[in-house]
């Protein structure tokens, strides 16, 4: 059986009451202070970069979850950040490359397990151009 996205949250984050119960498939409500908390999907963005030979740029994940696997450079959006900005920032942080002109390709819902908690995400993919591939290096969350 699929667990509720807020199953690990036992107390109301507003008043601390234990009367924090499931309201629907993605929210919990406090019977004491009437606060409702929704577990919305976390936004993420990934850069799809091709070189002149048509090869795709992938990075090897340095950390859990899925350490050692290959993925597109990317990560979670920060507060107040657009997905295009997220995509370019993550590309630079993980590879040293400065991208430009991100073009939306597609998005997919995903489940991301972190610290024993399943986070619902919405992963967006962007085609990104880079001017200088020679500046490439692994950094931040990428090991190679």
Predicted regions: what they are:
Residues 9-11, 27:
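Residues immediately within or flanking Cys/His clusters that coordinate Zn2+
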